[in-house]
């Protein structure tokens, strides 16, 4: 007689320990779904987890020593999924939320991302965090930095660590070319960023409270498109890029989602400023999928600000007609002249003085900040890594959710702000203006 035994092995890997795999040791084949790493974080360190399915031969007399009742009590957990539907007053009702953040070559934005994590006012004790680190460059230290910050996050010392790092950076008194753009930003924008990060603990009393759990996943998916602004936003790479991102999102969802999660919140790491109550605000509208508006600041010579996420939109007749002219596998890339859909974008509906509680129904959604009920993932909604109704990833996610009868909405006047990433043309213009300044001084 054979008994199938699946067990979990934990081996301790402390931050800074030589046993943490270095970047060059972590290159993985993107085609093997079993080729991944899982790390659990506590206040004391990072523990590597390996899940191995093993078939062991067990003698018949050994089985007689364990009753069915014993097996039932020790191996079976019962969850009534009716208890995890997701309420619009989630924190009040104890709804556990799964916070998901994909990371790739993200070490430069991690201080900002972790500040924004601590700034969340949704009860930290009800939030499970799962990071997915994937397809990073060989010399990138995103994984190691996430290790360090996550441990500090859980033992309450991250604020001090980030302040110390900032002081060391400022003491160097070196202004890099990457900082030049700040001289051309609207002063009120610079002031708002300083206000957001200069005394963050004053934002709410539970800023340092540890989260319910932190898990870090490491898995590559074969993404080779660069992380520069121009690389990521070139129209010719959008279809391929979005499908690979869909695979990564789906993998992370399946790996991290547990039966007791009521809500799932997706968040990009490069959000610069965002209200701390964003989760409660999105949740309060009682939609199955809800997104905020996403803008980004710009230098004064480009107009100060600009809509960033054009993937949240209301379908149009022109968009539907365009889809009819395309091949089944073609992906409509919203916001590009090559695909004239004439859709109403959530971003362009924004009124800076509008009612932040106003909601509009959407068909497509962007992935910068998505709150969704966990039940929709359990019922089959996902981020298509293939062409679905001539869309992929988050826009197809919105279409699929709508097609399956779930409510999808957006807040046109509730805005979060993405960082400004200078394009190649922007950098050329800044260089030209700097040369002009030097000529005027001389």
From Swiss-Prot:
Q: Its GO CC terms?
A: mannan polymerase complex
Instruction: Please name the InterPro entries in this protein's record.
Output: Mannan_Polymerase_Subunit, Nucleotide-diphossugar_trans
- Record-level GO BP terms: cell wall mannoprotein biosynthetic process; neuron differentiation; protein N-linked glycosylation
Family as reported in the entry's similarity comment: Belongs to the ANP1/MMN9/VAN1 family.
Q: What is this protein called?
A: Vanadate resistance protein
By its UniProt entry, which Pfam families does this protein fall under?
A: Anp1
Where on the tree of life does the source sit, at the highest rank? Eukaryota
Q: What GO MF terms are annotated? A: alpha-1,6-mannosyltransferase activity
| UniProt gene name | VAN1
Organism of origin: Candida albicans
SUPFAM superfamilies per UniProt: Nucleotide-diphospho-sugar transferases
